[in-house]
Amino acid sequence: MRVRFLKFICIFCFSFALVGLEAQEKKSPETLKIQEKEISVSTKSAEQPTEEKKEDTYIKEEELKPTSNQKKDPVVFGFLVDGYYNASLNRPDSKELQYTTQATRTNEYNINLAYVDAKVETDKYRGRLALQFGTSVVANYGGEGTTGKTSNETSIRNMQEAYGGFRLGKSTWLDAGIYFGHLGYESWISHENFVYTRAFSLDYVPYYVSGVRLSGKITEKLSYQLHLNNGYQVVTDNNKDISGGFRLEWNPTGNLMFRWNTFAGNEQPTATPKEMRYYNNFIAEWKPFEHLTLASSFDVGYQERASREDLVYTDNGPLYVRRDSNAFRQIYVGNIWFAYRFLPEWRIGTRLERYLDREQMIIVTNSKDGFQTGGATATLDYIPDPAVLVRFTYQYRRSMDSIYPHEAHTSKLDRMFIFSLSIKI
């Protein structure tokens, strides 16, 4: 009996355990669902502040982003400071160089050019205002004339450019005011050139003009400029005549450029007989590789003689010589440039030049053979940043006559070392 009773108790307990296990298995899915709901609710409650913060941050970022209705400021401001030390081997007593506008003060540190500017360019209008200072400014504007009380000659020397323009067509613009001249290969701003100083041909063509300019494209590879100006590098006109010229630029390929610039106008004051000047400037530039540039220019100029009597200079002094006809005076100029950036931060630039103005049409030396000069210039550039340019320049020039200041006298040679540092933003 006891054995049967014990068996009954064991079977009952085992059956009860199985029933309890089945009941637990049936209830576990519901329990898990409830637990999942509780976990999800708690997770949402915990994550809700983070999502709100993300949404607030997103809204703030969207507010900071410019919308299509907001216009960007079209005005861009910039400046340049170009300082130099000219160690002239001629060591002129006056410390002043002649026949150049660049680095004119010798054996002292000075500012060649400094300017601040504001530029604007949109689809419909454009313009630039730049105020400038420096020794090159004083030298370059020395010939600016005075024709009246309000002729503005005292203030324009500090005005590098002041012009405005608007679009006439798809690629046609009309500008008016004071702006850079169109003759020559090198820029007025040395920071943009391969060589620190300027070629003679660039120092004696207009860096600036005052007038009206029409520019545009004839084809995708051919562009033009038409100019009406007060004169040859003058803002204040010295006569009643209008001067002008044009530019044609052809880019047959992406690395080849040809340019033809012209000028025509009377350069004599109203009180003197008219002498028309005609100037042609031809330029070719080739960039066979990304860091290599080869360029050349050839200039030819003619100017009428006012009379058959021509002033010439002899060993015995100046005298007038009667000509058979009032033929034109002539000048011929040639330049070659080579620039190679052999390392990311280093570049070498060289220039060869020849200037022939025997009859002193543009450059007056008061010497027998006039201005017949040639030379070579080399500049080594260190470019630690696109805005910074450290330059080491050597320049050698030789003239047929003794015209260059040399201590208390003159010399046929002009040699100098120039160190310069410029920052352009």
Go through the PLM ranges and name each one.
Residues 103-136:
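Glycine- and aromatic-enriched membrane insertion/assembly motifs of diderm outer-membrane
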Residues 79, 107, 111-120, 161-166, ...:
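Residues on the lipid-exposed face of transmembrane beta-strands in outer-membrane beta-barrel proteins
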Residues 72, 121-125, 169-171, 181, ...:
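Outer-membrane beta-barrel channels and translocator barrels
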Residues 9-17:
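Bacterial N-terminal signal peptides
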Residues 79-87, 129-133, 176-178, 226-230, ...:
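Transmembrane beta-barrel strands of outer-membrane/channel proteins
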Residues 21-92:
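N-terminal periplasmic/intermembrane-space "pro-region" immediately following the signal or transit peptide
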Residues 88-108, 137-161, 168-250, 259-266, ...:
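Surface-exposed coil loops of outer-membrane beta-barrel proteins
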Residues 100-103, 140, 147-155, 256-262, ...:
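Outer-membrane beta-barrel pore domains
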